[in-house]
């Protein structure tokens, strides 16, 4: 399992839970992280709590109808706004499962917080006492990437830039809802070939301009923070972006030129002596060494494999102390 780095960008006054679960079953959504805003709280049994729980129940019901939904519950000052967004390439059943899990966990982890967001690999759920519909938001965000470098970094950077420019144009100019585009391409170069899988997605409440800005900022972060890794993904409240490369496949060896033909042997004059046949080639094992019983051993040099070890780096953007 490749070692990975996780980078969080969140305002300083947030607290968060995150996990990268290596032993989850296939039926469980993959939890990435949860961010709660502790500066805006409500009391138990308050109207806000009732509205929050009603909102989350409404999102659960809507998850069977599509990959995106938003909702508003209650009257001011206890109004709660919420949304969910499922990844565009998962099934409706997976979306329902993720949203049901996320709405339960976000209420459990952020018990009395008026604002919170929870990210899974398959979906995102959030709620807030402030309306965020159609608003461009970049934080809180999380970036996950591998420490395995991409093949031929200089050319890979050019390939990746061209590919995401194409995807961002396609997703922002598409009428599909939600904005979602994925692509797979076989990239061939002198060192060999590899498969490049790419994906971009925006929240459908964004207009074309803000969708483009969100994805370009996400790509800038992922391409400058991580040293061109072979795998990376970034989650923000309004868009997500990811890429992955397969193992580099070596090019087939060039056909070698056939060796020059040997000149025909010179005929020797007949000899009057009788010809003695050459003795057959016989391999004789060294004496006093027992014959092996068919087993053998050899040394294998393995790469450094670190299982379940995660390095976490937190960066606080001075200019990004915005509300969730």
Curated annotation (Swiss-Prot):
Ligase among keywords: no
GO CC annotation terms, alphabetical: extracellular region
Region (Disordered): 251-286
Keyword terms of this UniProt record: Repeat, Secreted, Signal
Top-level taxon of origin: Eukaryota
Start and end residues of each Gnk2-homologous domain: 29-132, 138-248
Localization terms from the record: Secreted
Main location: secreted
CDD domains reported in the protein's UniProt record: Gnk2-like
Record's signal peptide: 1-27
Family affiliation: Belongs to the cysteine-rich repeat secretory protein family.
Protein name per its UniProtKB record: Cysteine-rich repeat secretory protein 9
Taxonomic path: Eukaryota, Viridiplantae, Streptophyta, Embryophyta, Tracheophyta
